């Protein structure tokens, strides 16, 4: 099908600013030269309403004035006229194409430029029309307001669309080509040379190809050309086919087009279309042909012209109906049908695309709305989630509370039902048993009342709150209560088979087949309605609900509504929800409404009942009026009855109070009597124990006459020397027999004695019998031990005869010959006492004061046994680890014949050592492998199973205070050893309290000194209370105590037995807190509430006690040094610089070359020119000739210090004439004028002042004045200098007088330069960066000037000194002192690095400042010092101080290894240059001899005064020839003062017990406390707080309360007091010098390794093959009481009691 393509609404040369969009065909090629014609989407109104930018005039509305569509120019009036503006472009330019034009020519001006990029053929023949055109959307055609063109139908030319022609015009009217240039004849009048049309393209590949122009337009005056016959015939043959191939297309305008084109516009369009038709022939719209050039067309001849004219005339005269081809109407209808089909298909496709676009838009819109909804939900959740959660939680909590209340209420009601049931049964049983009818009726009424209560309670349990009488009304029973409304009944249905409760399973009713089918049909109908987007017909549920409710009411039970098929949307879930709603209503709402109605009904009935009662009262009022007198009588009787009742009640109350008071007094008197009886019983029990012990002591004392001889030198013996006289103090004494009683006396156990009897005769007899039995047991035990030894056969049996104690008095023991040393007199007496004890089988305590030779006395006993009795062992010596070497050395030294086996080391070593003695039947002789085994307490406990297998002849415990706790495993293990005798060596038998002495006595005599609480309390309570309260001690009790101790303990003090030993002077030095210490102390005190501490201390909680001890430790730290809390650190400003990174030091050699590479962050780049000589203004040279002006003229010609000028001035007696009197030449003056201040000072430093020596030669002022040289006349300062005189006076008073200014200058610290401020940041000088090497050289010379640095603070090194000697150079210039004084810190030097000042370190502590002054004096006096500390951290600080003062020292604490301790002590003893020995009080106070020192300083005191005594006795002992001075540093007004007072109280206890003296000389008016923790808490308070606490305590005592004590506080405190003491907690982790640990602690001396190895139990562990192993020990910070007890095993009872 052929036809013209649809026209475009715009001409290409009439392009608007915003061209109309028309999508190009997909197959159309792209042409680069058509870029200006490319179309884009429209953004403005249609382009036909815009004016073309290519024309300067409006388009003409006349169709005749339009230019030809083929692009040719309109007819010209003259051939010489230039081409018109409508002239088509040449073929070489833009090609010409056919224009689609849907708009009429009256609106758009035509132009031949085509928007397509196809070239046009160069011939003039019209080309064939394309079969098709690229399809565009039908909607694009609606953009035009004129759907029909005036030149054709649907945009096609009228020449190709056949219209019904009009009637034929008259024949005389013949149109010519001039008249009708667009006629068919005019078209056929073309050139003679025509080319065949190009082959037709397929519809898929066809492109719009325009027709070539037929001929050049001619004017109407020129004759038409004549065509040939052939040409005419050819045109005739082709015309029908052309017209026949064109269909007719008619299309009605759409609604949108009608809206755009009004009817009048359509009418105008139709008229315009009709006017273009003439003579029944449709006028062609335009000829789309491209004319060739004018010269290419041939000129017809005259003959050809005539023939053409003739043919044209024939054609004009002929009938034109013959041009219509047959079948044209059919083709037109087919074409229109196809057009309609295509339009419909396009419209459907557009609808589908529009639907897809709508769906896509709706999807995007839904996603956007979904996002908005999600965001809104998140915002709402974020804003309200917390409140909702809180609300839900609150609701749950409230529901839980209500549930608990309901459960409690239910339980109470169930209990009520159960009790009422019991009452009912009891009442029914009593009624059944009652004989009297009235009594039976009474019981029945009680049963009925109980039944009613049970019923009411059960109804309450079931949740029924309505009154009983309402619920009992049934439809069948009449309502007898009355009322204004009738009653109705809602009955209950039969109980359902399902379980009760909301959570039980619910059985749905079965449905019929019809119901199921109806539900299925309804579901299918609903699904189909949903698919068709139709509304669902949902039927309401009201009617079924009403019907079901009616059925429920009628039926009397609740039925579940069944789903009905009325709803089109009835599903299973819907029905379930619907039924669940109704079930909830039936379960919850209906009972609630019922209860409300029932309650309202009961309220109404109650009101009606009250109304009836009032009415009845009103009706009976007339009767009361007549009985008024009776009513008054009744009122008087009631009043009388009330008065009588009140009287009797008051009387009964008074009697009850009196009865209670009498009972209370009786109970109190009974308690008092019982207390008195118990006191008497305890007194008798105590008296029995003391009497028994006194008898034993008496028996032993009469045998041991040697102890009596010690009375001259032993104050304890003097105190206990008098015997007990009969008849004096009969309440506390018994008669001493002259001999031992009958051996057959019955022995009574302590538990079987009757202490309630008033007669004490039986108790005295029992005490005597028990004492005799104890003596006999000791004798039998010694005999039994000796019976197994062959060496004991030679003993005299009579000496062991306890029936004849007088024979012991004749024994006189001399010093053994085996002993190489010479015993002193008191030591020989001690040996005599020890031997007597051994021969009697009695254990003892040698308690000589420290330093009197307890060790040598013990060794002499072993030598005596070996020499006299041939007993060579085995002997067991147990001592602290620090004294093991001392024991081994002294035994080997004094008794070489006795072999010593040192038992210590690792487990493997000890296993090898046990081979020497681990035999059951070994015989010890002089040739045995060993005689004495020396070991430590820790190893004894570890290897207790092996020690228990051996029968030891003698066991000596050195420093026996290690077993002062009878509850420790160490005490129990040692007590279980098989040994004949035990000897305890201790210099301080009483350290903290009398309980420790009692533990020692209990150890040596377990059967006699049994662990009775009464005896131990008497031992400690009375004496300690005497020391605290300064009261008078019972002399009789003290005397009895001394008698008890006399046979078992021997103690001598130094001042009585050793006259040659120097005195010991103790001085307390009080120090004040510094500002920093006071701030720390106040801050600690403000943060602690003393009242809370005291209240907690009264309770006695272990955690509170630990907290209290921690506080005490913090306060003591403040007193010692504040740096124990926080050390001063090295500070430096922030350095803003680049630091060079060094290479790996591993790859370097021994010396690493570290150059100065620090650079500033700021660098100034400088050109090479400025750095060189040419860029300097003041440097003259070839590059800078003008720079020498300043040097030439200003520095030389104009300088007054030139030699020429000065010489002229001197000659003329000018300004420089003074140079001749100051010893200065012209050259020197010139040189000085050109030097700076620093250079002049450096040069003057090396000059020798010769003029000052004249003061030495001429000491007279007159001679000195006459000795002035003329050339030094003006050198007044140099001549008066006394430096040479000072050098002559090397020492003495003269030198001091001559150097007063210098000494003052140094003493005041004026020679010390300190920075005033420390910068926050520092940086090196800004460096200059240049390609020249001159800046680096100048920087190096400026920063590192050797001469300047040497002059300021440099000292000659060793290499310089060697070079001076080798080269023999004058050393004066190199040995001058630096110009700058010594910096404060040698490490920090003159930098901004602040190193902590040692002066500040010393002055920050008041103690350290006092110690600094004291050490200076002692150093000057030639003394040597033992410095004791409680904290090892303080020892660390003291090491820094001693290093700062250059004092030589050595250190020994718990971290020192055992093998190093011996060497350290030896160094101090042998090297006098060691000035100070730093020791820990607990570790360095035992077993070492430090007599080289004569001064002892306690930096901080110990809780236990005996610990300090042991420490100071390291120097004050045998071998000390000088006076020992003890200094104790105490901080005034702090806790240390109170600790010292408490230590003095403990010392008084020891003095009273041991010496027996009265309490005098010391003020003991201190606070008496039951709780030691409470006493320590008082130490933390100051005087004002202590006074306030005392006042509150006094008020509490007046009220009969215990101040600060809670419930069970006293019992808890007593219970914990037995477990651990406060002093143990304070010294937790410390050892007693016997540590073998090498790990230093942080706060105090640590626990020894041996103790930490294991935790031995009280019973010996069984043997485990190769040994027990070493295991891990407990930490020094163990928390439990059991671990602490194991940690301090044997150290219990060190608390500040």
Swiss-Prot record:
According to UniProt, the reaction catalysed is:
ATP + H2O = ADP + phosphate + H(+)
Principal location: nucleus
Compositionally biased intervals (Basic residues): 1663-1679
Note the SUPFAM superfamilies from the entry: P-loop containing nucleoside triphosphate hydrolases
Entry-linked InterPro entries: DBINO (IPR020838), DEXQc_INO80 (IPR031047), Helicase_ATP-bd (IPR014001), Helicase_C-like (IPR001650), INO80/SWR1_helicase (IPR050520), P-loop_NTPase (IPR027417), SNF2-like_sf (IPR038718), SNF2/RAD54-like_C (IPR049730)
Which portions of the chain have biased composition (kind: Low complexity)?
202-221
Query: Ranges of Polar residues compositional bias?
Result: 33-53, 85-94, 108-122, 272-288, 1646-1658
Membership in a protein family: Belongs to the SNF2/RAD54 helicase family.
Name of the protein this chain belongs to: Chromatin-remodeling ATPase INO80
Q: In which organism is this protein found?
A: Aspergillus niger (strain ATCC MYA-4892 / CBS 513.88 / FGSC A1513)
Q: Lineage of this protein's species?
A: Eukaryota, Fungi, Dikarya, Ascomycota, Pezizomycotina
Name the gene that codes for it: ino80
